[in-house]
Amino acid sequence: MNFKTALICFALLLIGTLCSAYSNQERQRDSRRVAEIMRTSLDDNTKINRIQELLTIYNRMAPSLRPDERARIDRFISRHTEGIIVDGVPSQGGARKIFKKTLSPAAKSVATGFFTELGASLASLFTSWFPTTTTERNH
C-alpha cells in the first residue's frame, strides 16, 4: 500500500510539473506579444504603462532561462525597480510593480529607457528560442 501511495504521489508531481512548464505555444505567444508591445509603444506614457506587462512576461519565462541569462536580467530589473518611490515611500515586498504616477522628465526618461532595454532583452531571448520567427516576419 505504501508503494502505491508513493507511486501515485510521484505521478501527480510529474504530471503537475509537466503541465505547469512554459510550453512552446506560450513562448511563441509571449514572443509575439513582446514584439507587439515594442512596436506599438510609441510615446513615453504608453511605454511606462506597459512595463508591468513586460515584467509579467519575464516572470513567466524566467524559470526556463539559463542561470546566467536569468541572473543578468534579474540584476537589471533590481537595479531599476528597487529605488522606485511611490508617494514618497520606497515600494516594499511582493511582486515588482511599476506604479503609474506623475513622473518628472528625468524619471520618465529612466522609465522609458528601462522599458526599451527590458523589451530588447526579452525580444533577444525569444529570438534565440525561435530564430525563424523574426526572419519570417521580415519577408
From Swiss-Prot:
It comes from Drosophila sechellia (Fruit fly). Disulfide bonds: none annotated. Coiled coil: none annotated. Keywords: Immunity, Innate immunity, Secreted, Signal. It comes from the Eukaryota. Residues 1-21 form the signal peptide. This is Protein Turandot B. Its main location: secreted. It is found in: Secreted. A humoral factor that may play a role in stress tolerance. GO terms for cellular component: extracellular space. GO terms for biological process: cellular response to heat; cellular response to UV; innate immune response; response to bacterium; response to heat; response to UV.
